[in-house]
Amino acid sequence: MIALIQRVSRASVTVADEVTGEIGPGLLVLLGVEKDDDEQKANRLCERVLGYRIFSDAEGKMNLNVQQAGGSVLVVSQFTLAADTERGMRPSFSKGAAPDRAEALYEYFVARCRQQEMHTQTGRFAADMQVSLVNDGPVTFWLQV
């Protein structure tokens, strides 16, 4: 399971001209689900995303996680993160989970974030989405479990 996390000043996701999720300061989480992923990996990735210390403390050091910084999380499914790009000029998506399994794990990940009392907004699984963000830093990390 893969999360591309970006520290943002604000972010939103729109589907068919309808805003489905919007946050102020926090994390935009682009989530990719791979074939061998399961709930245990989703739990671990959620723990890492919410605990990753990429927000500045009083001294300006990256020492706070999103909850400590008072931020929110916007989770957007992105199957292209599971692409195999090692060869050729066209990505292969053979490493990605089947859509029904990917959706179940995406929803599970979102539920785990909410169970941690994290203000969590979402996109819409498998929809054609428009994602807008103001990257803060920029600060972007690739987390994989």
Curated annotation (Swiss-Prot):
GO terms for biological process: D-amino acid catabolic process. SUPFAM superfamilies: DTD-like. It comes from the Bacteria. It is an enzyme of class 3 (hydrolase). One of its GO terms (cellular component) is cytoplasm. One of its GO terms (molecular function) is Gly-tRNA(Ala) deacylase activity. A motif (Gly-cisPro motif, important for rejection of L-amino acids) lies at residues 137-138. Its EC number is 3.1.1.96. An aminoacyl-tRNA editing enzyme that deacylates mischarged D-aminoacyl-tRNAs. Also deacylates mischarged glycyl-tRNA(Ala), protecting cells against glycine mischarging by AlaRS. Acts via tRNA-based rather than protein-based catalysis; rejects L-amino acids rather than detecting D-amino acids in the active site. By recycling D-aminoacyl-tRNA to D-amino acids and free tRNA molecules, this enzyme counteracts the toxicity associated with the formation of D-aminoacyl-tRNA entities in vivo and helps enforce protein L-homochirality. Belongs to the DTD family. Homodimer. A Gly-cisPro motif from one monomer fits into the active site of the other monomer to allow specific chiral rejection of L-amino acids. This is D-aminoacyl-tRNA deacylase. It comes from Klebsiella pneumoniae subsp. pneumoniae (strain ATCC 700721 / MGH 78578). The lineage of its organism: Bacteria, Pseudomonadati, Pseudomonadota, Gammaproteobacteria, Enterobacterales. The gene is dtd.
